[in-house]
Amino acid sequence: MGSLIFNANEVFEVAKRIERNGIAYYTKAAELMKDEAGKKLMIELAEMEAVHEQIFTHMQKSLSSEEHAEGLIDPHNDAFQFLQGMADKYVFNPKEDPMKVLTPGADPKTILDAAIEREKDSIIFFEGIKAMVPEKFGSKRIDEIVGQEMGHIIILTRHRDKV
């Protein structure tokens, strides 16, 4: 496969995938929660992820043609598949049972702490991927994704501090 190089468009596609995985994770967690407060919080977190996906879609539309860099040589789409696999495994794993992380009846603070950890994982993921996006293919745009994730942590932390 050789060394992996990504463009900003591919990273935005994966950012949206992570948000969709988050929606599925929190929706499933809501179904499994025994108490109403926990269910409500999971639904709110899923809704936040949906808004985030829309933000990334909007940001992606503003990418330049170079940031789409469709001329990268990757006939089997190996690089993008690698990127998707990493996102699925290390941020929100769509196959993971939320109850392995969240116990039924978990208090809202514990639930929010788990959500904050997921957001931190996404920041680490994007910071690592940024090194594989050449500047001409939009590496600086990855900072915009990280900024959005940091903003999400701030919102979740404020929410947690209120409970």
PLM regions and their residue ranges:
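Non-heme di-metal
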Residues: 1-163
